[in-house]
Amino acid sequence: MGGIFGVASKSSCVLDLFFGIDYHSHLGTRRGGMAVYDPEKGFDRAIHNIENSPFRTKFDRDVSELQGCLGIGCISDNEPQPLLVRSHLGNFAITTVGKINNMDELIEDCFKNGHTHFLEMSGGNVNPTEMVASLINQKASILEGIRYAQEKIKGSMTMILLTPEGLYAARDRLGRTPLIIGRKEGAHCVSFESHAYINLGYEDEKNLGPGEVVFVTPEGIEVLQKPGDKMRICSFLWVYYGYPTS
């Protein structure tokens, strides 16, 4: 399992991002990561191993060094992320939570389509988040790429992409894992679990439906793809992994 969180704010997002990710610590024990965007400094990222120390301890120093009004991050039980990507779609960061059951098939398809290599290897396997980025980059726009990734992946994949303009948030096409939008004055957040933003002053704004894609800025949200009509939630998340107040 794992948890993801993102913030689009008119002021610095770093503290909200830090605590929002930390509130997902019950969902993973291996890696934690933060990525932010600042118009002057560009993209910046920090990833740490949290197997022997909690997220809050490992990232305490990064909070004072990272700058930006837009950011995403994660608690991961598997691969290191978020990843920073440069492609024909521009520069973006991406974080995901889910499981790809047809990874070998997707790797072969990528090689046939001219993709020459994968850089991020985790435990001898291709990093699933890099695979998602590779699928997105095969299309003419980020939205088309997200749709394509949702169609090609057998399993489950929920994601947040960070661009210089805002955040793309996409829930798994069958709604197996949740994604929720919160709001407060001057900011919006995207969260895997709702309890992560309640203590940060956010209020519930929107629960994304299965396969729904939205674009998030400090001013508001824009629905780019409406939700589907089929829902298959991960009941194990609700009864075991999930935090009770969510």
What are these regions (language model features)?
Residues 1-246:
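Conserved short alpha-helical segments that host acidic/polar catalytic motifs at enzyme active sites
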